[in-house]
Protein backbone atom coordinates (compact mmCIF):
# COMPACT_ATOMS: atom_id res chain seq x y z
CA UNK A 1 0.00 0.00 0.00
CA UNK A 2 2.76 2.45 0.97
CA UNK A 3 4.65 1.82 -2.27
CA UNK A 4 1.52 2.35 -4.42
CA UNK A 5 0.69 5.64 -2.70
CA UNK A 6 4.27 6.84 -3.05
CA UNK A 7 4.40 5.95 -6.76
CA UNK A 8 1.11 7.74 -7.41
CA UNK A 9 2.42 10.82 -5.62
CA UNK A 10 5.58 10.87 -7.75
CA UNK A 11 3.54 10.65 -10.96
CA UNK A 12 1.29 13.49 -9.85
CA UNK A 13 4.25 15.68 -9.06
CA UNK A 14 6.00 14.83 -12.31
CA UNK A 15 3.16 16.15 -14.45
CA UNK A 16 2.66 19.31 -12.43
CA UNK A 17 4.00 22.58 -13.82
CA UNK A 18 7.24 23.82 -12.25
CA UNK A 19 6.74 27.03 -10.30
CA UNK A 20 9.96 27.51 -8.35
CA UNK A 21 13.65 26.88 -8.69
CA UNK A 22 14.92 23.82 -6.86
CA UNK A 23 18.20 22.96 -5.15
CA UNK A 24 21.65 24.39 -5.79
CA UNK A 25 25.10 24.18 -4.24
CA UNK A 26 25.25 25.52 -0.68
CA UNK A 27 21.55 25.01 0.11
CA UNK A 28 20.59 23.63 3.52
CA UNK A 29 17.37 21.61 3.50
CA UNK A 30 15.36 20.62 6.58
CA UNK A 31 12.46 18.17 6.20
CA UNK A 32 9.95 16.85 8.75
CA UNK A 33 7.03 14.46 8.49
CA UNK A 34 5.53 11.11 9.40
CA UNK A 35 7.99 8.22 9.12
CA UNK A 36 7.04 4.55 9.29
CA UNK A 37 9.44 1.67 9.89
CA UNK A 38 7.94 -1.53 8.46
CA UNK A 39 10.21 -4.54 9.18
CA UNK A 40 10.81 -7.10 6.47
CA UNK A 41 12.02 -9.44 9.18
CA UNK A 42 13.29 -12.99 9.52
CA UNK A 43 14.96 -14.74 12.43
CA UNK A 44 16.89 -17.75 13.62
CA UNK A 45 15.45 -20.11 16.18
CA UNK A 46 15.58 -19.18 19.85
CA UNK A 47 18.58 -20.63 21.71
CA UNK A 48 19.82 -20.58 25.28
CA UNK A 49 22.82 -18.26 25.15
CA UNK A 50 24.05 -18.33 28.73
CA UNK A 51 23.60 -20.46 31.84
CA UNK A 52 23.42 -24.15 32.68
CA UNK A 53 21.48 -24.96 29.49
CA UNK A 54 23.69 -22.93 27.13
CA UNK A 55 23.40 -24.17 23.54
CA UNK A 56 19.92 -25.63 23.93
CA UNK A 57 17.76 -24.99 20.86
CA UNK A 58 14.30 -23.76 21.87
CA UNK A 59 13.02 -23.51 18.28
CA UNK A 60 10.45 -21.00 17.11
CA UNK A 61 11.08 -17.57 15.63
CA UNK A 62 10.79 -13.87 16.46
CA UNK A 63 8.96 -11.08 14.65
CA UNK A 64 9.15 -7.30 15.00
CA UNK A 65 6.17 -4.95 14.62
CA UNK A 66 5.91 -1.63 12.70
CA UNK A 67 5.85 1.87 14.18
CA UNK A 68 5.33 5.46 13.00
CA UNK A 69 7.09 8.48 14.49
CA UNK A 70 8.18 12.05 13.64
CA UNK A 71 10.90 11.90 11.00
CA UNK A 72 13.56 14.59 10.60
CA UNK A 73 15.86 15.01 7.63
CA UNK A 74 18.80 17.40 7.22
CA UNK A 75 20.61 17.85 3.89
CA UNK A 76 23.44 20.00 2.56
CA UNK A 77 23.92 20.44 -1.19
CA UNK A 78 27.58 19.93 -2.11
CA UNK A 79 26.83 20.78 -5.76
CA UNK A 80 23.63 21.50 -7.71
CA UNK A 81 23.10 17.73 -8.07
CA UNK A 82 24.86 16.09 -5.13
CA UNK A 83 24.06 16.37 -1.45
CA UNK A 84 24.79 14.77 1.90
CA UNK A 85 21.83 13.89 4.11
CA UNK A 86 21.18 12.80 7.70
CA UNK A 87 17.99 10.97 8.68
CA UNK A 88 16.82 11.21 12.29
CA UNK A 89 13.56 10.54 14.12
CA UNK A 90 11.92 10.39 17.51
CA UNK A 91 12.47 6.94 19.09
CA UNK A 92 10.61 4.04 17.50
CA UNK A 93 8.85 1.47 19.70
CA UNK A 94 8.47 -2.05 18.30
CA UNK A 95 6.57 -5.03 19.69
CA UNK A 96 8.65 -8.21 19.71
CA UNK A 97 6.71 -11.48 19.38
CA UNK A 98 7.97 -15.04 19.70
CA UNK A 99 6.09 -17.93 18.15
CA UNK A 100 6.63 -21.67 18.38
CA UNK A 101 9.53 -21.59 20.87
CA UNK A 102 9.79 -23.66 24.04
CA UNK A 103 9.28 -20.58 26.19
CA UNK A 104 5.93 -21.52 27.70
CA UNK A 105 3.74 -18.48 28.49
CA UNK A 106 6.34 -16.14 26.94
CA UNK A 107 5.27 -17.26 23.47
CA UNK A 108 3.36 -14.34 22.01
CA UNK A 109 4.33 -10.79 22.88
CA UNK A 110 7.72 -10.96 24.57
CA UNK A 111 7.91 -7.20 25.06
CA UNK A 112 8.85 -3.94 23.35
CA UNK A 113 12.13 -2.44 22.16
CA UNK A 114 12.96 1.19 21.38
CA UNK A 115 15.53 2.33 18.86
CA UNK A 116 16.97 5.34 17.05
CA UNK A 117 18.11 4.85 13.42
CA UNK A 118 20.42 7.73 12.33
CA UNK A 119 21.35 7.25 8.66
CA UNK A 120 23.95 9.26 6.72
CA UNK A 121 23.61 9.17 2.91
CA UNK A 122 25.07 10.63 -0.26
CA UNK A 123 22.17 11.75 -2.45
CA UNK A 124 22.08 12.43 -6.21
CA UNK A 125 19.51 14.71 -7.91
CA UNK A 126 19.60 14.07 -11.69
CA UNK A 127 17.41 16.96 -12.91
CA UNK A 128 18.40 20.54 -13.64
CA UNK A 129 18.02 22.98 -10.75
CA UNK A 130 15.41 24.91 -12.74
CA UNK A 131 12.96 22.02 -12.31
CA UNK A 132 10.55 22.28 -9.38
CA UNK A 133 10.23 18.48 -9.35
CA UNK A 134 13.41 16.92 -7.97
CA UNK A 135 13.56 13.11 -7.75
CA UNK A 136 16.66 11.65 -6.14
CA UNK A 137 18.45 8.45 -5.22
CA UNK A 138 20.85 7.87 -2.38
CA UNK A 139 22.96 5.35 -0.51
CA UNK A 140 24.69 5.44 2.83
CA UNK A 141 25.26 3.88 6.22
CA UNK A 142 22.91 3.33 9.14
CA UNK A 143 23.58 2.93 12.85
CA UNK A 144 20.66 1.57 14.83
CA UNK A 145 20.85 2.14 18.58
CA UNK A 146 18.55 -0.13 20.57
CA UNK A 147 17.56 1.10 24.01
CA UNK A 148 16.68 -1.20 26.90
CA UNK A 149 13.43 -3.02 26.26
CA UNK A 150 10.34 -3.64 28.37
CA UNK A 151 9.34 -7.24 28.98
CA UNK A 152 5.59 -7.87 28.66
CA UNK A 153 3.61 -8.54 31.84
CA UNK A 154 2.79 -12.03 30.60
CA UNK A 155 6.46 -12.84 30.03
CA UNK A 156 7.43 -11.33 33.39
CA UNK A 157 4.86 -13.51 35.14
CA UNK A 158 6.58 -16.53 33.57
CA UNK A 159 9.97 -15.47 34.98
CA UNK A 160 11.39 -13.54 32.00
CA UNK A 161 13.06 -10.13 32.29
CA UNK A 162 15.74 -7.81 30.91
CA UNK A 163 14.72 -7.77 27.23
CA UNK A 164 17.55 -6.22 25.17
CA UNK A 165 18.86 -6.02 21.61
CA UNK A 166 22.34 -5.40 20.21
CA UNK A 167 23.09 -2.27 18.18
CA UNK A 168 23.58 -2.56 14.43
CA UNK A 169 25.63 -1.08 11.57
CA UNK A 170 24.31 -1.55 8.05
CA UNK A 171 23.94 -0.13 4.56
CA UNK A 172 20.93 1.90 3.40
CA UNK A 173 19.47 2.86 0.02
CA UNK A 174 16.70 5.30 -0.85
CA UNK A 175 14.62 6.94 -3.53
CA UNK A 176 12.63 10.10 -3.02
CA UNK A 177 11.37 13.34 -4.50
CA UNK A 178 10.94 16.99 -3.57
CA UNK A 179 8.41 19.28 -5.21
CA UNK A 180 8.95 22.99 -4.70
CA UNK A 181 5.79 24.87 -3.71
CA UNK A 182 7.70 28.15 -3.35
CA UNK A 183 11.37 29.10 -3.55
CA UNK A 184 11.82 27.70 -0.04
CA UNK A 185 8.97 25.30 0.81
CA UNK A 186 8.64 21.80 -0.63
CA UNK A 187 6.64 18.60 -0.38
CA UNK A 188 8.77 15.50 0.12
CA UNK A 189 8.28 11.75 -0.09
CA UNK A 190 10.90 9.03 0.31
CA UNK A 191 11.36 5.27 0.61
CA UNK A 192 14.39 3.61 2.18
CA UNK A 193 15.62 0.09 2.67
CA UNK A 194 17.91 -0.36 5.66
CA UNK A 195 20.02 -3.38 6.56
CA UNK A 196 19.51 -3.95 10.31
CA UNK A 197 20.74 -7.17 11.94
CA UNK A 198 20.45 -7.58 15.70
CA UNK A 199 20.49 -10.15 18.47
CA UNK A 200 17.56 -10.06 20.89
CA UNK A 201 18.22 -11.32 24.43
CA UNK A 202 15.94 -12.11 27.36
CA UNK A 203 16.74 -13.53 30.81
CA UNK A 204 14.84 -16.29 32.62
CA UNK A 205 15.42 -15.96 36.34
CA UNK A 206 14.10 -19.28 37.62
CA UNK A 207 14.96 -21.94 35.03
CA UNK A 208 18.09 -23.92 36.08
CA UNK A 209 19.27 -21.09 38.31
CA UNK A 210 18.95 -18.45 35.60
CA UNK A 211 19.59 -18.57 31.85
CA UNK A 212 19.58 -16.15 28.92
CA UNK A 213 17.86 -16.84 25.60
CA UNK A 214 18.96 -15.29 22.30
CA UNK A 215 17.49 -14.99 18.82
CA UNK A 216 19.19 -13.48 15.74
CA UNK A 217 16.82 -11.14 13.91
CA UNK A 218 17.20 -9.56 10.47
CA UNK A 219 14.89 -6.55 10.78
CA UNK A 220 15.76 -5.13 7.32
CA UNK A 221 12.89 -2.62 7.23
CA UNK A 222 11.29 -0.57 4.51
CA UNK A 223 11.10 3.01 5.77
CA UNK A 224 8.50 5.43 4.39
CA UNK A 225 8.40 9.18 5.02
CA UNK A 226 6.06 11.91 3.76
CA UNK A 227 6.28 15.51 4.88
CA UNK A 228 7.29 19.09 4.20
CA UNK A 229 10.69 20.68 3.80
CA UNK A 230 12.26 24.12 3.99
CA UNK A 231 15.33 25.29 2.05
CA UNK A 232 17.70 27.85 3.56
Regions found by a protein language model. Give the residues of each.
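Cleavable N-terminal export/targeting peptides
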Residues: 1-26
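Transmembrane beta-barrel strand/turn architecture of Gram-negative outer membrane proteins
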Residues: 119-121, 169-179
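Outer-membrane beta-barrel translocator domains and adjoining extracellular loop/strand segments
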Residues: 42-50, 95-105, 147-158, 200-208
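Gram-negative (and chloroplast) outer-membrane scaffold detector with strong preference
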Residues: 27, 38, 73-152, 219-232
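Extracellular loop and loop/strand-boundary signature of outer-membrane beta-barrel proteins
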Residues: 56-60, 103-111, 155-163, 210-216
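Short sequence motifs at beta-strands and strand-loop junctions characteristic
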Residues: 62-68, 112-117, 163-170, 216-221
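Short glycine/proline- and aromatic-enriched beta-strand/turn motifs that initiate or cap beta-hairpins
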Residues: 21-73, 229-231
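Predominantly the C-terminal beta-signal and adjacent terminal strand-loop region
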Residues: 93-97, 182-232
Amino acid sequence: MYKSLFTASLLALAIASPIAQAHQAGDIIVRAGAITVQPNDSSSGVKVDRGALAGTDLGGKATVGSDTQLGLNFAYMLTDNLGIELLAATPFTHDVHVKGAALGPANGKLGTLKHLPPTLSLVYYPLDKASAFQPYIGAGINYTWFMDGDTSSRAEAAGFSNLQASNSWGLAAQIGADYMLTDNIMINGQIRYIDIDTQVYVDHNTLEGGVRAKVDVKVDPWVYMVGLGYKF
